[in-house]
């Protein structure tokens, strides 16, 4: 079974003062931990300082997006190599908010993931359906297409992470049922095995829809759930650590 990954996504939140939360998490995650792997994906302005705060601990730091190109005339964008240089070892690509706000297509997401792999950092590739797509019975069709087109050619199964984020459950307080999560995660696992063979069983699949300390134990017990991509509950160390401890049991 893949090692559990508990990943936080701060989104567009956090100033330098909020790095105290990073320090609190780092203090509770030993470098020698064999339990769940722990990651905080921070705004670009906090990655370097966050990496310094977590040094010597088991807490890893990541970015929230990257550009598909390695450098050039792309004002305001960040290359994956820049994130790595600042201390990131992971990067989220294809989050539904990026897809909606910035028009990032599956092809763009694949290019971003490829750029991350070239830079030596792990892409967390997000997939998920909208409420309209779920109500129309299109969930598995949407997931199958996103999986086929968002994972770059040449990627190795163990070098990527998949995050299933039902768009209708992000930041809404609504959470997919255990049955709904199991159906999609099992489908994703089958798609990974179809693409990568037995190596597809090594790819971690995270759930990313309003996970919090109150529901984490139930979600983490679902088949083929290898961790969480956590939004609001990652902003406070106490909440994030509560989920980490549940995963580490």
From Swiss-Prot:
Keyword vocabulary terms for this entry = Cytoplasm, Gluconeogenesis, Glycolysis, Isomerase
What residues bind substrate, as annotated?
9-11, 171, 210, 231-232
Entry's EC annotation: 5.3.1.1
Q: What superkingdom heads the lineage?
A: Bacteria
Active-site residues (renumbered) = 95, 165
Q: Would I find Secreted among this entry's keywords?
A: no
Compartment(s) where it occurs, according to its Swiss-Prot or TrEMBL record: Cytoplasm
Pathway(s) it belongs to: Carbohydrate biosynthesis; gluconeogenesis; Carbohydrate degradation; glycolysis; D-glyceraldehyde 3-phosphate from glycerone phosphate: step 1/1
Q: Which GO terms describe its cellular component?
A: cytosol
Q: According to its UniProt record, which protein family does this protein belong to?
A: Belongs to the triosephosphate isomerase family.
Q: What PANTHER family does this protein map onto?
A: TRIOSEPHOSPHATE ISOMERASE
Record-given protein name: Triosephosphate isomerase
Specify the species: Hyphomonas neptunium (strain ATCC 15444)
């Amino acid at each position: 079974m893949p090692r559990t990954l508990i990943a936080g996504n701060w989104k567009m939140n956090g100033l330098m003062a909020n790095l105290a939360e990073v320090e609190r998490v780092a203090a509770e995650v030993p470098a020698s931990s064999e339990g769940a792997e722990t990651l905080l994906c921070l705004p670009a302005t906090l990655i370097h300082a966050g990496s310094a705060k977590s040094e010597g601990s088991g807490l890893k730091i990541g970015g929230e997006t990257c550009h598909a190109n390695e450098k050039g005339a792309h004002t305001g964008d960040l290359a994956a190599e820049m994130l790595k240089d600042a201390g990131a070892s992971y990067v989220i690509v294809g989050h539904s908010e990026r897809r909606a706000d910035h028009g990032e297509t599956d092809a763009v997401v694949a290019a971003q993931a490829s750029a991350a792999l070239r830079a030596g950092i792990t892409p967390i590739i997000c997939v998920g359906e909208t409420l309209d797509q779920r109500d129309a019975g299109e969930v598995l069709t949407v997931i199958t297409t996103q999986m086929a087109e968002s994972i770059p050619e040449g990627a190795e199964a163990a070098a990527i992470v998949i995050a299933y984020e039902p768009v209708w459950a992000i930041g809404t307080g609504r959470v997919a049922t255990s049955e709904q999560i199991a159906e999609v995660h099992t489908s994703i696992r089958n798609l990974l095995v179809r693409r990568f063979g037995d190596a597809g069983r090594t790819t971690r699949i995270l759930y990313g829809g309003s996970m919090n300390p109150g529901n984490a134990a139930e979600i983490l017990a679902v088949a083929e759930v290898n961790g969480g991509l956590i939004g609001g509950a990652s902003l406070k160390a106490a909440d994030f650590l509560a989920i980490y401890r549940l995963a580490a049991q």
